[in-house]
């Protein structure tokens, strides 16, 4: 009997003390055996991970449910993977929406009127810091877009103070103090006639045009080429569109198209007014009208040349710029100068040869160093509110109190631009665009 029981227990059909079991063939035709990795019967639940009666103990490893461990581990891995994916998505979104800020965008300390007077008297007794005009190249770069480069050396120019009313003194309204133009109170200009003709017409004497430039960073090609819009400011917050400008994509040097049609900023558009073109280093810019370079009937005319002083030594200081304009006739019209005409010289060639008969040379007004704010300051009479390396005022050496043009920042993407005789809107807007462009060898 005992031998029979031992033989029976040794038969393949019985439960063995192992998880490897060779099952008995179910039929004679199926001679291949099957492997069962489990216990057969109630004993299965004792060793099974899914034992419903199992008591889990935190102290012993054997009391931890393997399924719970695997589930917890998988859940933790999934949460970690999800967190990593979210972090990568946030990083990509941050990079895609990230906009390079100006290095010079720093808090502005507004000087009160009595402090401004005291600072002015103190600065008048001290020697003013000289203008460093270096004519060489450096690798300091500019900021504005992903395609543009970053300024490293130019110091921001801060507004010197807020006047009770803009352009109240001789600097801007020509009131008689011995230095102004003697025009008395100036009137604010308005658009006369068609836009395309108005933007090319020199400003009348005694008229001031207050404008605003808005920078659209989205622009074209995912923000690599911002679009700039020029509006004439009117009362009660109203504004009139004048010009739009954008940088051309496929150009060896910086090349801006300027148009009076905001919906079509192309060279073939009906509203095409002119263009701004720079040299390789971004130190010299030439403004042209919409004339044809090859045409003899309506040749392309030079409207202005903007030259930024180069700086190889990295001196900290505001930008130094020179603007050369065509001279004015007795009836307040521009002298026609064309570098495309082989019979005459362009504005830049005339300036290099010191032939100043038919051209006018302007310079940016030298800012004054303020020891209290530790910055360069200019009085923009409330029109500029933020420090920026782009802030400037253009004057003529013979009359430094007559501000031909001023440009400066009021917010991250909004700038004010005011101009008067002898500039036109096209010239002033192009000068402002040159300030936005990257400059390899400046600052």
UniProtKB/Swiss-Prot annotation:
Residues 57-80, 98-191 are annotated as: Disordered. It comes from the Eukaryota. It holds the Pfam family Tub. GO terms for biological process: protein localization to cilium. GO terms for cellular component: ciliary membrane; cytoplasm; nucleus; rhabdomere. Keywords: Cell membrane, Cell projection, Cytoplasm, Membrane, Nucleus, Phosphoprotein. Residues 177-186 have a biased composition (Gly residues). The modification Phosphoserine is found at residue 136. This is Protein king tubby. Residues 113-128 have a biased composition (Low complexity). The keyword Nucleotide-binding does not apply. The keyword NAD does not apply. It is a peripheral membrane protein. It is found in: Cytoplasm; Nucleus; Cell projection, Cilium membrane; Cell projection, Rhabdomere. Residues 68-80 have a biased composition (Polar residues). Belongs to the TUB family. Transmembrane segments: none annotated.
């Amino acid at each position: 009997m005992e031998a029979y029981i031992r033989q029976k227990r040794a038969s393949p059909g019985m439960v063995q003390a192992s998880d490897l079991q060779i099952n008995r063939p179910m039929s004679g035709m199926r001679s291949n055996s099957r492997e069962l990795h489990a216990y057969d019967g109630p004993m299965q639940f004792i060793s099974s991970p899914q034992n419903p009666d199992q008591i889990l103990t935190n102290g012993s490893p054997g009391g931890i449910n393997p399924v719970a461990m695997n589930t917890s581990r998988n859940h933790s891995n999934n949460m970690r993977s999800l967190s990593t994916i979210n972090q990568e998505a946030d990083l990509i979104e941050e990079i895609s929406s990230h906009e390079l800020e100006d290095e010079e965008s720093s808090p502005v300390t507004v000087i009160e009127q009595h402090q401004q007077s005291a600072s002015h008297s103190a600065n008048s007794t001290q020697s003013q810091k000289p203008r460093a005009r270096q004519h060489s190249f450096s690798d300091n770069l500019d900021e504005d877009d992903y395609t543009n480069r970053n300024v490293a050396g130019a110091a921001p120019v801060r507004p010197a103070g807020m006047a009770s009313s803009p352009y109240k003194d001789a600097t801007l309204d020509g009131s008689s103090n011995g230095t102004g133009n003697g025009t008395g109170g100036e009137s604010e200009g308005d658009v006369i006639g068609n836009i395309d003709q108005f933007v090319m017409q020199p400003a009348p004497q005694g008229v001031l045009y207050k404008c605003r430039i808005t920078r659209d960073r989205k622009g074209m090609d995912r923000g690599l080429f911002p679009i700039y819009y020029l509006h004439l400011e009117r009362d009660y917050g109203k504004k009139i569109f004048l010009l739009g400008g954008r940088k051309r994509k496929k150009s060896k040097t910086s090349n801006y198209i300027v148009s009076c049609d905001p919906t079509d900023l192309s060279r073939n558009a009906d509203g095409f007014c002119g263009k701004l073109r720079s040299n390789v280093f971004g130190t010299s810019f030439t403004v042209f009208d919409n004339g044809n370079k090859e045409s003899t009937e309506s040749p392309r005319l030079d409207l202005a040349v903007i030259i930024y002083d180069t700086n190889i030594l990295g001196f900290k200081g505001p930008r130094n710029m020179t603007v050369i304009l065509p001279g004015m006739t007795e009836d307040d019209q521009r002298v026609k100068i064309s570098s495309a005409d082989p019979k005459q010289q362009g504005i830049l060639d005339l300036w290099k040869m010191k032939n100043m008969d038919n051209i006018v040379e302007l310079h940016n007004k030298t800012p004054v160093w303020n020891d209290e704010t530790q910055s360069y300051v200019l009085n923009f009479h409330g029109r500029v509110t933020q420090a920026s390396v782009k802030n400037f005022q253009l004057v003529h050496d013979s009359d430094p109190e007559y501000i031909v043009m001023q440009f400066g920042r009021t917010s991250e993407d909004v700038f004010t631009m005011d101009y008067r005789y002898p500039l036109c809107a096209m010239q002033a807007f192009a000068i402002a665009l040159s300030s936005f462009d990257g400059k390899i060898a400046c600052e």
